Amino acid sequence: MNKLFTFIMLWMMSCLPTLAQAPMDGGVWKDNTGKHINAHGGNIFNYKGTYYWYGESRSQDGKPYSSLGVSCFTSKDLKKWTNHGLVLPVSNEPGSDIEGGCIIERPKVLYNQ
């Protein structure tokens, strides 16, 4: 009986990878404009059937650590992403916590009623 139970459990666990579906099979993830998704250190969460991806938007001018701010992308299926631009751009105000040239590490978004 114990051997049968072990066999059934192992067989069931071997079926799990076939049930899981990857949102994408690799390659470059692009948004609705055809550009590479620029959301470094971000997180994805689901709210009312829409996935939201917030992350640091980094400069594309050859300066790998120059932050532009926090960008937002949305998707219904984790495959097709819509770019909503910068939702929190860096500030031109000297001394600001998000002053131009800063690095924004792992931005988070909290729901506020």
Regions found by a protein language model. Name each.
Residues 6-15:
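Bacterial N-terminal signal peptides
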Residues 19-113:
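Carbohydrate-active catalytic/glycan-binding domains of CAZyme proteins
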